[in-house]
Amino acid sequence: MAKLVYGMNQSLDGYVDHLAFRPSPALFRHFMEQLRDLTGSVYGRRMYEVMRYWDEDCPEWDAEEHDFAAWWRSQPKWVVSRSLKSVGPNATLVQDDIEAVIRGLKAQLVGEIEVAGPNLAGSLTDLGLIDEYRLYLHPIVLGRGKPFFSGPRPPLRLVSSDLIGEDVIRLTYVPA
C-alpha cells in the first residue's frame, strides 16, 4: 500500500510560495534524493501548471536542473482539475470522484505518492487520505500568501526533525 505525503517549503509565518524559496544546493540535492524514491505525484491544477516549466529543456539549466526535468517527465502524475481538458506526458487527468481515485492509487501502488499544492492537500486532509506531512521551514517571513494548510489544521504528531543544509528544517508529522 502506498503512503500519501504532502510536503512543501514554508515560511516561518506559515506561507508557501514557490517563488520565495529557491532551494540551496543542499536542499536541491535532498529533494532529488527524495524524488528518486517516489512512486508518483498528485497535483492540483495550479501546481501542475507551475511544474509544466520542466516539460521542455532550457539551455541555461545546469546538470542538476536537467536531471530534475528528466525525472519530472518520466514520473507518473495524476492531475486533479475540473477545468483542464488535457494534461501532458505521463499524466492522468482526475476530474471526478477524487476520493475513490486516490484511495485506489494508495491500494494498488507501493512506496510514496507526493501531494503537491495546498488546496489539493487541504481536500485530501479533509478526506483523511494524507499519511505524512513534511514542512520545509525556511528562515524567512512572507507576511502574506497561501498557507501550508488551506483549511483547519489537522491534529498532528511530530515524528522527526532534520536540518537540511545550513538553514532549512524539515518537520515530519503524521495524523494524531
What role is predicted for each listed range?
Residues 1-176:
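Enzymes that bind and transform nitrogen-containing heteroaromatic metabolites
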